[in-house]
Each structure stands twice: as C-alpha cells, then as structure tokens.
C-alpha cells in the first residue's frame, strides 16, 4: 500500500517549474515543454506504474490523448490506481483537464512529494513499459494550431504585388476559407523569391488545416456525447416531475437556465422552421 502525503504547503523543497519538468522528462524519457501538458494524465499513470508495478494497466492509458474526454479517461485510470493502492488524495480532474498552469503545477508539486515518499529506487524502463508510445500532446491542440496558422499566414507567405486590397484581407481570406492545395498554389513558385521555402510552408499549412479539421471533429463528438447525457437526465426528470421533488425541480431549473439576454424561440417559430426544412426535401 502507498504512503500517503497530506502536506501541500509551499516549502523550500518545492521545485521550480523548470526543475519539475526536468524531473518528469528525465524520469519518463519525455520531452514536455510546459507544465500544462500534464493535463492529459498519462504521465501520472506511468509514474504509478513505476512506483507500484501492476497497479495500472498501461494499455488502457491514452498516451497520445488530445481531447478533454481522453484526458478524463486517463484520470479515471489514475483514480482506479489510487483506490487500489489506498491513496487518499482527491484528484481535481475537472480543473486539471482544462490545461491551466496553476492547477497542474499545484498537483505535480503534491505528486512529487508523494513520489519521493514511495519510490524505492528500483530500475524502471519507461520506454519499454509504454512500448515506445509518444506522450507529449499539447494542452490545447486547437488553440496551438490556430495560433501557429495565424503567425505563418500573416508573416511567412509572400503577398501578391497587386496594388488593390490590404494585406490583412488576403491573410484572413486564406484562414477563413479552407482551401485545397491546388487553390493555395495560385502563383507558381518560379514567380516568387524563395519558391522552395514557400512550397514547404504551404505543405505545412495544409497539414495544419487537416489537423484542425480532426480537432473540430473530435470536439463535435465530445459535444454530442455530453448533449446525449443531458438529454437522458432531462427525460428522467420529466418522468418524476409530478412528484414535486425539490431536487428534480432544481435539476430542471439548471437544465433550462439561459444566459441573460437570450430568448428561446417560440413554438410557432420552431414549427415554421421545421415546415421549411420539410419543403426543401
């Protein structure tokens, strides 16, 4: 069973963010660059495998997780390992998976103390344990792709010599319209300086667009997943609404709550839109 650690106060023994990253990377043979990358939960699962061999099935860990529901899955695996080894620590999953620095830094500080209290110095091969899988997803893949794309499009791609139209109109057009490679290559490389470099940039942008589409698809699946759960909760509440239970009433109030200034559509408007949709078919 594990030795529990309850102290969370800041002391001289606390490592800086750089030292903490160095410890994580050296211990697990990773290449993390930010504390926020710990939000996937994969590193903690492997640390538990290092401390208590057999308490975690590493095959269940999504080492290449990129979406929030995948992070949650990894933390569920970690919670199961904590329960199995008698670790009393409550994992703030909802905060950690958001990828915020402060929440993840506080948790890794506690985990480092927990690790030091339980590690017996035995040899461990992290690459062999995870079978060579990469464990370095960005905390927010969508944001990273957006930011990188804007930077490259706004500064790296040469502009046309046409006197009409400001530069920002050209760059925004490229970003808002997801164009295939043939459209992005309007000007031949020979007509511009640094043609080969521009070709490489175009290929990179096309790959980023593909990655962005995959991210959006994943977010849509995640949205549908949680919407389905909310719908199931709504149906259960409606079945017991006649019981006048304050709990049921409270849940229904939360489900139907709207932001200030938002007006839900009237029934006749909904019927009108439904009729229009049927007419189209």
Curated annotation (Swiss-Prot):
APC-binding, as annotated region: 217-260
Keyword Cell division: yes
Subcellular location: Cytoplasm, Cytoskeleton
Composition bias type Polar residues, residue spans: 158-175
Predominant location category: cytoplasm
Superkingdom of origin organism: Eukaryota
Effect upon mutating residue 226 to A: Loss of localization of CAMSAP2 stretches to the Golgi apparatus
Annotated region described as Disordered, given as residue ranges: 157-181, 261-281
EB1 C-terminal domain boundaries: 194-264
UniProtKB keywords: Cell cycle, Cell division, Cytoplasm, Cytoskeleton, Microtubule, Mitosis, Phosphoprotein
GO molecular function: identical protein binding; microtubule binding; microtubule plus-end binding; protein serine/threonine kinase activator activity; protein serine/threonine kinase binding
Pfam families xrefs: CH, EB1
GO biological process terms held by the UniProt record: cell division; positive regulation of DNA-templated transcription; protein localization; protein localization to microtubule; regulation of microtubule polymerization; regulation of microtubule polymerization or depolymerization; spindle assembly
Stated family: Belongs to the MAPRE family.
Oligomeric form and interacting partners: Homodimer. Heterodimer with MAPRE1. Binds monomeric and polymerized GTP-bound tubulin. Interacts with APC2. Interacts with DCTN1 and SRCIN1. Binds to the C-terminal domain of APC. Interacts (via C-terminus) with CLIP1. Interacts with SLAIN2 and SLAIN1. Interacts with AKAP9. Interacts with PDE4DIP. Interacts with PDE4DIP isoform 13/MMG8/SMYLE; this interaction is required for its recruitment to the Golgi apparatus.
Protein name: Microtubule-associated protein RP/EB family member 3
Source organism of this protein record: Homo sapiens
